[in-house]
Amino acid sequence: MRNRFLSLSILALLALTGCGAGDPAIAVDGSEGPLVIYPDYKDVTIPANIAPLNFRYAMPDVRKAKTTFTLGDKSVTIRGDEVEWRLGAWKKFLEGAEGQSITVTAKAVVEGKPLTDQWSIQVSEDPVDGWLTYRLIEPSYQMYHEVSILERCVENFDETAICDWQHTDNACMNCHVHGQSRGDYSLYYIRGPQGGSILNQNGKLRKLSLKTDGMLSATVYGELHPDGRFGVFSTNVILPSFHAEAVARMEVFDSASDLTVADFENNRMINVPHVARADAWETFPCFSADGRAVFYCVADTVSLPDGLMEAKYDLVRADFDPETGIIGEQVDTVWSGRTHNASVCHPKASPDGRWLMFTVSDYGTFPLFHPECTLYLADLQSGEIRPMDEIKGNKSDSYHSWSSNSRWFVFASKRGDGQYGKPYFCHLDSDGRTTKPFVLPQKSARFYLYNLKSFNVPDLGNASTGMTVRDARRMFEAESEIFQ
């Protein structure tokens, strides 16, 4: 059988290949219509507390552009091919706009031809959580240095570093997650010899060593329990590989993985022997909204790397005892990857307990470069599960998180160029209907044209974490609390 994958040592010779540069004035994933804009904010639904939707006309030789926004008896006109609002003017314009529609009328001369376009922007009655954390990282194979975890206020353009490479001796860091979308309850990792799990509980920071001698590795993926005492995690032996053919570029897969529970009150790890099967891989656990169940992904082991495309992860559920931290022995299948010839990762329960969102790709658990990767939505009341095809991009849609009101979610997507992940927001109503996703607004209309880093693991919070890089340095230099 022909080996589908190349080793890292061989691929080092291929790292110098590049891609041709196209016309920077033309957006790969710009809007439709007579006048192409990027980012595409045509016919989207937004929360009233979002930052200004700044955009540019992504066409060559744009002249005499005039864009008029109308909301009731209010009207604002911006001239030029880059439409950038002053923050105060945008906020004033949106005062009392909840439940109403903005009409945008655009006129411009493009390559000597006068064009007119019109679209609407619906303002939702539901606000979105005001803070978004993400890791900024090069979309490459070996670049883990010069990494940072940032917190952005989505109501304006303020961005603060929570942790960065300059304050951690160029250590790798990853996976900042909020517990129940709370700003004062979160966790992230600093990797390496001086690393640890940085737990934020009500503003108090702790550096934890979530690893015992009997575990495969330190904790990798996981989530914090709503009550604050426990966390559920996977321990993974992770290997990278590369496709010899132009299919999905990079792969990351587990050669071994188990589940474990961390007791933050008693500094102990709780093994789950009845779940940690020798003939299966378990990963990506999360809690139900009430904290009484754990959802996770599990697959039968296969021979690696040749058998990776046969790794089909199921989505399963088990009870969780919030008094003891014990995961129940009965495991029920929520969605079978094997039956659907597909694979599940990244399950996330909505805070109101109604929905469970997860990611589906053809195989494995690293869908970042899988263009087929799609978000699925499970209604935990009715049992209905469906692919969210209506919001699917032309490239992978992967990691996602919920706003605390369960009416908005954000997800990472490589739609467009296929290289750089960006955070997209989407509204979900009480019946599970979605609206057209829109990308995180930026102060400069040309930001995404020149940005060369991926937004990785976008996670919403209802308040600021309050953490800074000085805190990261202090934690980096601190001794880790040992877990038994």
Sequence positions of predicted segments:
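Positively charged n-region of N-terminal signal peptides that target proteins for export
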Residues: 1-5
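Bacterial N-terminal signal peptides
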Residues: 7-17
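Sequence signature of WD/YWTD-type beta-propeller architectures
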Residues: 19-484
